[in-house]
A protein has these predicted regions:
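A conserved regulatory-domain signal marking ACT and ACT-like small-molecule sensing domains
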Residues: 1-87
């Protein structure tokens, strides 16, 4: 299963490192990544391959990063993401 992870917050050192390290520890492959900084606002979208990983466990760990770094992080199934953003 593929999932989309979005991260938004004040730009600070280590955001990409924290998220990608957690994904690495769960053997989750990053298929695509887009990251932009607009003034002090950091935004990132990742497409990941969740094969063998439990969405709930990953969401829980992302919530920990979200709280620790004062970010907004969301994860959802790629199919749901695409359905919600179809014009």
């Amino acid at each position: 299963m593929k999932a989309v992870i979005t991260v938004i917050g004040k730009d600070t050192v280590g955001i990409i490192a924290k998220v990608s390290d957690m994904l690495y520890r769960h053997n989750i492959n990053i298929l695509d990544i887009s990251q932009t900084i607009m003034q002090e606002l950091f935004t990132m979208i990742m497409l990941v391959d969740m094969q063998g990983a439990a969405m709930g466990d990953i969401a829980d760990e992302l919530k920990e990063i979200e709280k620790a770094m004062n970010l907004s992080i969301h994860i959802q199934n790629e199919d749901i993401f695409n359905s919600m953003h179809r014009i």
